[in-house]
From Swiss-Prot:
Gene Ontology BP annotations: translational termination
CDD domains: RRF
Subcellular location, principal: cytoplasm
Function per UniProt: Responsible for the release of ribosomes from messenger RNA at the termination of protein biosynthesis. May increase the efficiency of translation by recycling ribosomes from one round of translation to another.
One Pfam family in the UniProt entry: RRF
Family annotation (InterPro entries): Ribosome_recyc_fac (IPR002661), Ribosome_recyc_fac_dom (IPR023584), RRF_sf (IPR036191)
Name of protein: Ribosome-recycling factor
Source taxonomy: Bacteria, Pseudomonadati, Chlorobiota, Chlorobiia, Chlorobiales
Alphabetized UniProt keyword annotations: Cytoplasm, Protein biosynthesis
Molecular function (Gene Ontology), one example: ribosomal large subunit binding
Entry-linked Gene3D superfamilies: 3.30.1360.40, Ribosome-recycling factor
Organism annotation: Chlorobium limicola (strain DSM 245 / NBRC 103803 / 6330)
PANTHER family reported for this sequence: MITOCHONDRIAL RIBOSOME RECYCLING FACTOR PSEUDO 1, RIBOSOME RECYCLING FACTOR
Amino acid sequence: MKVKEVAQKIEPKMKKTIEAFQHEIASIRTGKATTTLLDRVKVEAYGQLMPLKQVGNIGVMDVHTLIVQVWDKSMVSATERAIRDANLGLNPSADGQNIRVSIPPLTEERRKEFVKLTKKFGEDSKVSLRNLRRDMIHDIEKLEKDKAISEDDKNRGKKEADDLLHKFEKQLSDLIALKEKEIMEV
């Protein structure tokens, strides 16, 4: 195995870390109605917890309102309760088989909490990226120890690991800044 192969093994994992971060922050409120806001909501249905999107359709009515069309009428109250209990600061109201979810404007304090949460998710992702870099360097050092590569190749490999880390940390920082701007926008 050569340095390039080690890098090709690690880079997709770093991309997945960025994608996981994007998915994680998608459910953080920004004051606008988006269907991803309800991604983490689990409904007690048929004796088990199910994701909300498996119980009904989620749609955007307008900038400040989501609508959930529950497929099974008997699940309306459980779905409404799950949305209310999800600790998202939302107050759903049932209307037949539909549930309207009004998105209240965020207070300054709540916005700051969401920014802090975004930064926490970002820091967790940076730790994952650094761990992947460490694994890459470990693999490269093992190759050198096994005499599969020269010391120069090892040093080039370490530099490549650092370059990969910087590239993905920059992407992460840009995403954090963008989400922070989105949250603080009134």
